[in-house]
């Protein structure tokens, strides 16, 4: 009988807002502290010649320009390029030597949902055996989950049309 009574009582919970915040405007927006340190692209060295680059949340069927700094690696010379084996969804745009290492600019195409990893191999112009593996990791959201807050160094450069949308030229079978 105690179990029957427990189910009949509605539970009411309240949300409290801090003084000075508008309760109506706060329901649909998440506000982040401006001093957050994790709002930049994170580059982690996994081994002697391997790096993991975390670019945060991206939206499916969008193209992004990603810029990050790769620490100086003794094995690489000033003239590095993308190795012949490359990904369809990650394209190297430029490599610029800077005092901290290299400024890498690439274009990433978010082609499916989930946590995606795309690899890029950077090789020296003169030495075939010298290369650095760069893995770009992104969390790709579907089109119905809003617009992600992009990290510093990530810029949306375009969206690709969906074939099943009303933007399609195909009108179906007659």
Swiss-Prot record:
This is Adipose-secreted signaling protein. Keywords: Acetylation, Phosphoprotein, Secreted. Belongs to the ADISSP family. InterPro entries: ADISSP. It holds the Pfam family DUF4517. GO terms for cellular component: extracellular space. It comes from the Eukaryota. One of its GO terms (biological process) is glucose homeostasis. GO terms for molecular function: protein phosphatase 1 binding. Adipocyte-secreted protein (adipokine) that acts as a key regulator for white adipose tissue (WAT) thermogenesis and glucose homeostasis at least in part through activation of protein kinase A (PKA). The modification Phosphothreonine is found at residue 147. The modification N-acetylalanine is found at residue 2. It comes from Rattus norvegicus. It is found in: Secreted. The lineage of its organism: Eukaryota, Metazoa, Chordata, Craniata, Vertebrata.
């Amino acid at each position: 009988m105690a179990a029957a009574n427990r189910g009949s009582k509605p539970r009411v919970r309240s949300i409290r807002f801090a003084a000075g915040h508008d309760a109506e405007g706060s329901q649909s927006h998440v506000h982040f502290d401006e001093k957050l340190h994790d709002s930049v692209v994170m580059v982690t060295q996994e081994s002697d010649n391997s790096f993991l680059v975390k670019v945060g949340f991206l939206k499916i069927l969008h193209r992004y320009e990603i810029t990050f700094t790769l620490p100086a690696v003794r094995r690489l010379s000033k003239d590095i390029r993308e190795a012949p084996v490359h990904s369809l969804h990650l394209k190297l745009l430029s490599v610029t030597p800077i005092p901290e290492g290299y400024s890498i600019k690439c274009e990433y195409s978010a082609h499916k949902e989930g946590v995606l990893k795309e690899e890029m191999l950077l090789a020296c112009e003169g030495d075939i055996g010298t290369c650095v593996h760069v893995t770009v990791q992104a969390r790709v959201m579907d089109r119905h989950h809003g617009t992600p807050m992009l990290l510093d160094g990530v810029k949306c450069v375009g969206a690709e049309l969906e074939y099943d949308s009303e933007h399609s030229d195909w009108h179906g079978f007659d």
